[in-house]
Amino acid sequence: MADVLSVLRQYNTQKKEIVVKGDEVIFGEFSWPKNVKTNYVIWGTGKEGQPREYYTLDSILFLLNNVHLSHPVYVRRAATENIPVVRRPDRKDLLAYLNGETSTSSSIDRSAPLEIGLQRSTQVKRAADEILAEAKKPRIEDEECVRLDKERLAARLEGHKEGIVQTEQIRSLSEAMSVEKIAAIKAKIMAKKRSTIKTDLDDDITALKQRSFVDAEVDVTRDIVSRERVWRTRTTILQSTGKNFAKNIFAILQSVKAREEGRAPEQRPAPNTAPTDPTLRNKQPIPAAYNRYDQERFKGKEETEGFKIDTMGTYHGMTLKSVTEGASARKTQTPAAQPVPRPVSQARPPPNQKKGSRTPIIIIPAATTSLITMLNAKDLLQDLKFVPSDEKKKQGCQRENETLIQRRKDQMQPGGTTVSVTVPYRVVDQPLKLMPQDWDRVVAVFVQGPAWQFKGWPWLLPDGSPVDIFAKIKAFHLKYDEVRLDPNVQKWDVTVLELSYHKRHLDRPVFLRFWETLDRYMVKHKSHLRF
């Protein structure tokens, strides 16, 4: 049986009449409730783990009846009549499918459970006015109709009885035919009579009982239909309802995997206390009688005790190395040494606990218009020279999600000598991917200008101002010296770094000033990090 959305499309394209009576929508000999769900997915549902929701028949039928209205007027009228509206992104695609312009739609979920419509019997179902009219008739007419039906059925049964084979006819035929032939003919005639009488009886009894049992049959049918499920095969499951095949199939695989894991629990040893019969529980334990062969169980063990021979041992499943080493290798395995308690001054965390990272993090803008990007961040901050991002693209450089730069600096030793050391810094342009514990290691951020750069950041004020962010993270702004300063950067606590368009020999002092400013900030606020 077709789904309600396909039936509605067929009636709409063929301009057939759709009857709405009470809480039911009637399509010829089938009917569905108004609030029955179709298999057309509502836009915006079924994403990011949310369950899918479907339009009801009433909402789609209301859209067809008011398709001439503009969408705002249609929404107001639907809200007045308390009917769910069809959302604007679904309106054009849904109307194109219902009007026959397209054969299918990507929003139709073929795997959704179908609501089976109730079949309306034209002979049994009667209109409400006819039922009221018959209720006003005298009771005698109904009794008279039933009596006439019974007399007609009895007359038909009597007619069949007259046609039954008579015994004297069998006696007359016995002279001309054998007993086997007569029995075969009699069996054929009786079989034919039984089938004929059975068919007539079914028709008459059905005609008599349809009036009184029709409501009970409808209730039973509705209960059966409500328990039905859509028959799924390998072919129907592998048919994706959308453009993304993995979204449908991988979800099914995950459900199958979860179900299989749930069916195979850990195998635990059976408890010793097994349920026993109460009659056996009450019986007293019978003392074991003497057995002359019990002594044989300990005889072999006593004879080989001095040779240390395991008479029940085996080499099955053992490797050559384990056989040659013998028991000596097993004796060398000593039990694990007990941990020696240490004084509090020498206490240290267990080796399996992961220590927090001390590598500082620098955040740069993700916009391609920024002077510093993931393509040239290593050239600017590590090599202290400016290389435009476009030039790096021409060289075939690939953009990475994050990069690790090695800053070379001179560190003063206690003896007064300086040693060149290398300190790592982590550079990222996707701050929303940072873990909550990583934000404590963020030491610098390059500001582009617009405030939307800090959307989703911690410490952001309700009005979207990043003032509190700059109080916890050192902010820098990189621009050309001939470009006008952004108004937002002017009013924020940001250190401006200016580069020349053509004088590349001036790049090194600019980036050295960046590192000096950052070092002073980290000494004061981030001294627990490595720098």
Swiss-Prot record:
One of its GO terms (cellular component) is nucleus. Keywords: Cell cycle, Nucleus, Transcription, Tumor suppressor. Its main location: nucleus. A motif (Nuclear localization signal) lies at residues 125-139. Residues 260-303, 325-358 are annotated as: Disordered. InterPro entries: Cdc73/Parafibromin, CDC73_C, CDC73_C_sf, Cdc73_N. One of its GO terms (molecular function) is RNA polymerase II complex binding. Residues 338-352 have a biased composition (Pro residues). Residues 293-303 have a biased composition (Basic and acidic residues). Residues 273-282 have a biased composition (Polar residues). Coiled coil: none annotated. GO terms for biological process: endodermal cell fate commitment; mRNA 3'-end processing; negative regulation of cell population proliferation; negative regulation of G1/S transition of mitotic cell cycle; negative regulation of myeloid cell differentiation; negative regulation of transcription by RNA polymerase II; positive regulation of cell cycle G1/S phase transition; positive regulation of mRNA 3'-end processing. It holds the Pfam family CDC73_C. It comes from the Eukaryota. Belongs to the CDC73 family. Tumor suppressor probably involved in transcriptional and post-transcriptional control pathways. May be involved in cell cycle progression through the regulation of cyclin D1/PRAD1 expression. Component of the PAF1 complex (PAF1C) which has multiple functions during transcription by RNA polymerase II. PAF1C associates with RNA polymerase II, is involved in transcriptional elongation and in histone modifications including methylation on histone H3 'Lys-4' (H3K4me3). Component of the PAF1 complex, which at least consists of CDC73, PAF1, LEO1, CTR9 and RTF1. This is Parafibromin. It comes from Gallus gallus (Chicken). The gene is CDC73.
